[in-house]
UniProtKB/Swiss-Prot annotation:
Belongs to the complex I LYR family. MZM1 subfamily. Assembly factor required for Rieske Fe-S protein RIP1 incorporation into the cytochrome b-c1 (CIII) complex. Functions as a chaperone, binding to this subunit within the mitochondrial matrix and stabilizing it prior to its translocation and insertion into the late CIII dimeric intermediate within the mitochondrial inner membrane. Modulates the mitochondrial matrix zinc pool. One of its GO terms (molecular function) is protein folding chaperone. The keyword Kinase does not apply. It comes from Scheffersomyces stipitis (strain ATCC 58785 / CBS 6054 / NBRC 10063 / NRRL Y-11545) (Yeast). This is Mitochondrial zinc maintenance protein 1, mitochondrial. Interacts with RIP1. The lineage of its organism: Eukaryota, Fungi, Dikarya, Ascomycota, Saccharomycotina. GO terms for cellular component: mitochondrial matrix. Keywords: Chaperone, Mitochondrion, Transit peptide.
């Protein structure tokens, strides 16, 4: 493994652990489980020799980190039965602009359009 891949792998690993702390900060069992999965995956990928496979594994770990930080939101059930969502400054909040435009082409079968099935031939 090249020196650049070693440092990239270490950086990706640290970022993944940081992402789990952000995403699951108030849920210790889930936080522990997520960190264990990342550690197991990282340990398993230590056996990789091909530079392309190593780069792909690093890229996937970086994508997982980004997804955890931007898309996972923890919720707490309140006494009134409603849920309080714990958003943070890095949570990705969509503006739903494509839905407001009524652009059904981007929605595919979610737009209620008939979908051609294999059995329709």
């Amino acid at each position: 493994m090249s020196i650049s891949n070693v440092s990239a792998a270490k950086s990706a690993y640290r970022n993944a652990l940081r992402a789990t702390r952000i995403a699951f900060r108030q849920d210790v069992p889930v936080l522990s489980s997520a960190r264990l999965q990342i550690k197991d995956g990282f340990t398993k990928n230590r056996e990789l020799k091909d530079e392309a496979e190593i780069s792909e594994a690093i890229s996937k770990l970086n994508e997982v980190s980004k997804f955890l930080v931007q898309n996972i939101v923890q919720g707490e059930k309140q006494e009134d039965g409603k849920y309080f969502l714990n958003f943070h400054e890095k949570t990705e909040l969509g503006d739903n602009e494509t839905i407001r435009q009524g652009n059904k082409a981007n929605l595919g079968s979610l737009a209620g359009a008939k979908v051609k099935k294999c059995s329709d031939n």
